[in-house]
From Swiss-Prot:
Keywords: Cytoplasm, Methyltransferase, S-adenosyl-L-methionine, Transferase. PANTHER family: ELECTRON TRANSFER FLAVOPROTEIN BETA SUBUNIT LYSINE METHYLTRANSFERASE (PTHR43648:SF1). One of its GO terms (molecular function) is protein methyltransferase activity. Methylates ribosomal protein L11. S-adenosyl-L-methionine binds at residues 131, 152, 174, 217. The gene is prmA. It is found in: Cytoplasm. This is Ribosomal protein L11 methyltransferase.
Length: 280
């Protein structure tokens, strides 16, 4: 297959901007992404490339005061998903208890929980601070026989770990069709059951739950907007873990959560990224 290589320059160039840009571009047909100096490099099949769609995605970019420009060239004839996986996705060990790797990795470190994923983008692999923060929470808390919702599941790495630790039943939801397909593949790779994957946003939560545990690793604006729907799926004693934002954003998250009846428990941080825990 023939691909285009797009180079996107973002201002400000932050991890949050690049994360959201990758999600937006994924909906526009892009398959693989590599963070680069000044922005993001992304690959899309030439047959699927619609420049009007790309321009509209940039025009409607959800983060205000962000400038995005791009150039593109015809990429060399190679499998860019495979290229990214082999050159940029390396095994990662979290808290000395959980190792995340792909099927092609050799000499993988041993850990209590061994998760195999075949991602096709640089998010949801465990390398990003927000993912590793939530993984740490899942490792530190009792999950056995607790129902769990993974909202904005991405690769479903969090739901897979939760299921390995005894959570059941588990539901994983993402708005992106690619994430749903990749989640199903990763769940099969890890031979876990009782994880139902579906496509949707917070509006799809109507009639679901209540859940003992909800995890949502998305971004600040979506979390603030969808908090009420999360709380509607909780019962007294339910736990809500959220990440995808910076430490400076915690007051905004906490204010909205407490307005909806949640109690702040704690926060953890890594390289300015934060994860918070609330109970209902």
């Amino acid at each position: 297959m023939k691909y285009f290589e797009f180079t996107f320059h973002t201002s400000p160039c932050t991890e949050t901007v690049n994360d959201v840009l990758a999600a937006v571009l994924g909906e526009a047909g892009f398959e693989s992404f590599v963070e680069s100096e000044g922005g993001l490099t992304a690959y899309i099949q030439q047959a699927l490339c619609d420049e009007n769609t790309i321009k509209n995605a940039i025009t409607e970019f959800p983060l205000p005061d962000t400038e995005i420009t791009y150039t593109y060239v015809e990429a060399e004839d190679k499998d860019w998903n495979e290229e990214w996986e082999k050159n940029f996705f390396q095994p990662i060990v979290i808290d000395n208890r959980c190792v995340i790797h792909s099927t092609f990795h050799k000499d993988v470190p041993q850990a209590t929980y061994d998760i195999v994923i075949n991602p096709q983008m640089a998010f949801g692999t465990g390398h990003h601070e927000t993912t590793s923060l939530i993984i740490g929470e899942l490792l530190d808390n009792e999950l056995k026989d607790k129902s769990l919702l993974d909202m904005g599941c991405g690769t479903s790495i969090l739901a897979i770990l939760a299921r390995m630790r005894g959570a059941r039943p588990c539901i994983a939801i993402d708005i992106d069709e690619w994430c749903v397909r990749n989640s199903i593949e990763n769940i099969e790779l890890n031979h876990v059951d009782d994880i139902a994957v579906s496509q949707g946003d917070a509006s799809s939560l109507v009639g679901k739950g209540p859940f003992d545990i909800i995890i949502a690793n998305i971004n600040r604006n979506i979390l603030l907007n969808d908090m009420k729907q999360y709380v509607a799926c909780m019962h007294p004693g339910s736990e809500l873990y959220m990440s995808g934002f910076y430490v400076d954003d915690i007051p905004f998250i906490r204010r909205e959560a407490e307005k909806n009846g949640l109690t702040f428990v704690h926060h953890k941080e890594k390289n300015r990224w934060a994860a918070v825990k609330f109970t209902y």
